Swiss-Prot record:
It holds the Pfam family NADHdh. It is found in: Cell inner membrane. It comes from Xanthomonas euvesicatoria pv. vesicatoria (strain 85-10). It is a multi-pass membrane protein. One of its GO terms (cellular component) is plasma membrane. This is NADH-quinone oxidoreductase subunit H.
Amino acid sequence: MNELLLNLVDPLHQWFLGLGDGGVVLWSVLKILLIAVPVIVAVAFYVVWERKLIGWMHVRHGPMYVGMGIFQAFADVFKLLFKEIVQPTSSHKAMFVIAPLLTLAPAFAAWSVVPFDAKLVLSNANVGLLYLLAMTSLGVYGIILAGWASNSKYAFLGAMRSAAQVVSYEIAMGFALVGVMIASGSVNLSQIVFAQAGNSGFFDWFLIPLFPLFIVYWVSGVAETNRAPFDVVEGESEIVAGHMVEYSGGAFALFFLAEYANMILVSFLISIFFLGGWLSPIQGWVNADVSPWIDWLWKGGWPWLLMKVFFFASAYIWFRASFPRYRYDQIMRLGWKVFIPLTIVWIAVTALMVFYGVIQKGV
């Protein structure tokens, strides 16, 4: 299936290169659109799925029966786009406008190094993991800027909460990925997936030897995206909407889009780092040469990656529907007193497992 896609993309790439410098620019613009458009479409359907899943959990009639809930998310988009963007008179006008863009840009830029299959990646960077750490850390600057530029005590309090929370859990996420780097011997995302390949199927994935780091990265990813039960940044019962309290219309929609794009991104990264990315859970168990439309079931391919992503993306919604919000001090305590010490200990354990051959790098 991967070869079929490449047969379509390669001739198109060569045609653009044949146009000279202008073709190179057009190809770069096309690659940007290849990131932005699918992410925006994925966010739209993710919102529909969130409404339907929570509707099933809460037995709500709207998302379950009225048009199957499909039109509610799109109605929200049109409502926000046609609303007026009102700026507070005491706000910093330029920074107020820049803040949502500064939040959205890193959320989209991070996708450029995410591999969907062995050869299906926009930029196969050798430092892809470090690039991702940098991009996922930049989004908080837009939140801080929004809180400061709004000149509102609620917005500023939400921004300060976000800064402390992201810094705390960014350290835990970084340490968790150090374990992945030690186990794989690479910071290239495709090579990290290949390091989990073998003839034992899912037993070769990093999920088993790095299970504590998997849990830390997963929970930290939820906290990093400010989602329930770590959504104190925009705690409705305390600070109304946090850093977004003064935003409306399209500007508010940009924050919304960045949040959901980051949720999908974290779901992809968990699948790549710990669940073998596009690898099949029965890799090496079946050897049969049949149609490329079927052999991905045991040889691996992007459908496996999408199924893993779907599970983690749905887990985000499940967390929101099931767990109450943590207090701010509980979130800080969990990050600094539990996750960071645990990751430091397991980095040492991972190094020993690699040294003694317990973790074997794949093909």
